[in-house]
């Protein structure tokens, strides 16, 4: 069934494909020195480009999973907000928390935000699968936090997997989800005293 957010996923697919096919990774990646010189747009564009085709394929597969299984749980605007907030949180985190990172590329951090947001939204419609997916994602993030990238993932991506970006992206997804839930929770707590 068609959902307006499919346009968003298609745009991400096409843009990331073209940037890799045209070998524009170096022009669009997060580049700390260029950002310091005023190219602030690189704070967002770095999330669209990928290092190599296998990295792109992994990210697009993740995007397809979000599209086919989770996208109907939120509107185009909500998904776009998750993408922008997750990308912003990742870029801020890389900028302030990881000052030794000079370059960053990849959609995987934003994907973690999309997945966690989608899983939390899924708990409203399909509680069992929503809670299972949320638990699996938190387990994966916990593993990565303490142990680094999953075995074999750096071979598939062609470089270092910045697991901190996965965690930061997930935080971005949670921020959007909480921003949507808090008004409802406050209303229930303070206005529905039945």
Regions found by a protein language model. Name each.
Residues 3-10, 78-82, 128-135, 164-167:
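Alpha-helical transmembrane segments of integral membrane proteins
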Residues 100, 106-149:
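Multi-pass alpha-helical transmembrane bundles in non-GPCR membrane proteins
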Residues 9-85, 91-104, 156-163:
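N-terminal TM1-TM2 helical hairpin plus the immediately adjacent luminal interfacial "cap"
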Residues 1-4, 10-14, 48, 144-194:
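C-terminal transmembrane module of polytopic alpha-helical membrane proteins
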Residues 17, 63, 88, 134-145, ...:
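Hydrophobic alpha-helical transmembrane segments of multipass integral membrane proteins
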Residues 17, 68, 91-96, 114, ...:
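Alpha-helical transmembrane segments of multipass membrane proteins
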Residues 1-3, 68-78, 121-129, 186:
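Membrane-interface helix-boundary motifs at transmembrane edges
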Residues 54-63, 105-116, 158-180:
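Alpha-helical transmembrane segments that form the membrane-embedded catalytic/substrate-binding core
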């Amino acid at each position: 069934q068609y959902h307006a957010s499919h346009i968003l996923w298609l745009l991400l697919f096409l843009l990331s494909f073209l940037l890799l096919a045209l070998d524009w990774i170096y022009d669009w990646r997060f580049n700390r020195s260029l950002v310091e010189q005023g190219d602030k747009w690189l704070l967002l564009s770095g999330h669209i480009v990928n290092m190599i085709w296998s990295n792109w394929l992994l990210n697009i597969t993740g995007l397809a999973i979000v599209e086919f299984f989770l996208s109907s749980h939120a509107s185009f605007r909500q998904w776009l907000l998750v993408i922008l907030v997750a990308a912003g949180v990742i870029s801020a985190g890389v900028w302030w928390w990881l000052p030794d990172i000079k370059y960053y590329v990849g959609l995987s951090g934003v994907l973690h935000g999309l997945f966690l947001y989608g899983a939390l939204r899924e708990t409203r419609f399909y509680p069992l699968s929503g809670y299972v997916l949320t638990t699996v994602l938190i387990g994966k993030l916990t593993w990565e936090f303490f142990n680094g990238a999953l075995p074999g993932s750096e071979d598939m991506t062609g470089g270092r997997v910045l697991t901190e970006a996965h965690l930061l992206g997930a935080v971005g997804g949670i921020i959007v989800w909480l921003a949507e839930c808090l008004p409802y929770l406050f209303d229930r707590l303070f206005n529905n005293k039945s």
